[in-house]
Amino acid sequence: MVYICSPLRANARFTMEENLERAKAICRHCAVNGVLAIAVHLYFTQFLDDNIEEERVCGMEHGKALLAMCEEVWVFGDIISSGMQAEIELAEELGIPIKYFPDVDAWLGGKIC
């Protein structure tokens, strides 16, 4: 299983909604190409509110537990958020291989948003 690490919150380039759409596109691309991938920020935001700090922390902690079960971490985008950095550092500590894909649109084969 591959852990998808990409931004959730709005940044200099994308809104939160756009970041979620990009994560969905990444996961869809993985699925149709035979890669079992999980993007915890897509899953946990279905029932936890990322704007409530307590719920955000809960989601991040559960996400770290899932990350520890993965064989690889794939990092998408050229903007690394603080949450992404924490995931990268955890993967490094656990010895989980990390792959970087700074150009999401190129990786997907075309612009998605």
PLM regions: where:
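Catalytic phosphate/metal-binding cores of nucleic-acid and nucleotide-processing enzymes, i.e., regions
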Residues: 1-113
